[in-house]
């Protein structure tokens, strides 16, 4: 079984969806378990209830989904999760597709002071070029090598070159610090501009990957109109 945190987003493959989504079969999500992020007692209980049945836990480094304010885990949360996974032989997987390189060039797990067993990157990895990466600990290589996987663009040299150039550039510029500074400047400016026009804007999450919403807009219609006008 695989543990997911409620409110997650891990792409659109059927196994990452909920059963009530169109086209998703019961068999594809039969082994999915769900629990609230940052609720360690609930996670501990879930591990106890399904002891010996859980193979992996997949998560974003912090809750940075849409339609809800983003938030960080409590201090020490990830360290407790890491130990819980170790004690139960569960693979800890971090989905760093969106947040990767924005918080720490070594990965968002490094930012929070723990080490994932598997971590995946995309988006910022090559500044928009079509390449992604799955990194993990040495002991999992033999397991992964036994999984059948193929692709049409593995010999595309340009995305790989772009990825190497992008990573070198990010190291040179210390982009996590730069993105944080620029993000704070941008979100502060947007909130101030909103106030000047009678709107209460709320910015949450990392300044380099912020979520912005209009307060008291339960239907999100104002938000959609605003985005459309931009």
PLM region descriptions:
Residues 1-230:
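Conserved N-terminal phosphate-binding loop of PLP-dependent enzymes in the Aspartate aminotransferase
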